[in-house]
Amino acid sequence: MDERIRAAALEYHRTPKPGKIAVTPTKALTNQADLSLAYSPGVAAACDEIVRDPATAALYTSRANLVAVITNGTAVLGLGNIGPLAGKPVMEGKGVLFKIFADIDVYDLNIRQLDPDKVIELSLIHISRSLAST
């Protein structure tokens, strides 16, 4: 890689705030009333509705617009087996593409697990209920 591009890429990833993605609230939280609706006791109303009808999770949570970009770092975008932590910038980059081009929110998950069956189990069985279309 050209040294100028390398330096510019490192600066891009480092400043003004490290990384390329962030979690931002979709609701106001500016006073005690907002806090009571967002958390306790108001959040219980949304929980009760989801218990009554799980399909309402799409109405009361961000789940319908949330996906995960998951890697264990063994085959990262032309870089090979670089591990989950070194693969994080690539996963964040994929998250940016989802957000900018499709307005889909993304969590990047970088898993320290080499067994593909366990990665799939974690992804599809243990965390998938937090994500869209599961």
What are these model-predicted stretches?
Residues 2-11:
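Ser/Thr/Pro-rich, acidic low-complexity intrinsically disordered regulatory segments
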Residues 15-59:
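An N-cap/entry alpha-helix motif that binds or orients negatively charged groups
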Residues 30-31, 71-81, 98-109:
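Gly-rich Lys/Arg/Thr-decorated short loops/hinges at beta-loop-alpha junctions or inter-strand turns
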Residues 57-63, 68-70, 99-100:
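Solvent-exposed alpha-helices and their adjacent loops that cap or buttress functional pockets
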Residues 77-91:
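Glycine- and acidic-residue-enriched helix-capping/strand-helix junction motifs
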Residues 118-124:
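N-terminal small/polar loop signature for handling phosphorylated ligands or for N-terminal nucleophile
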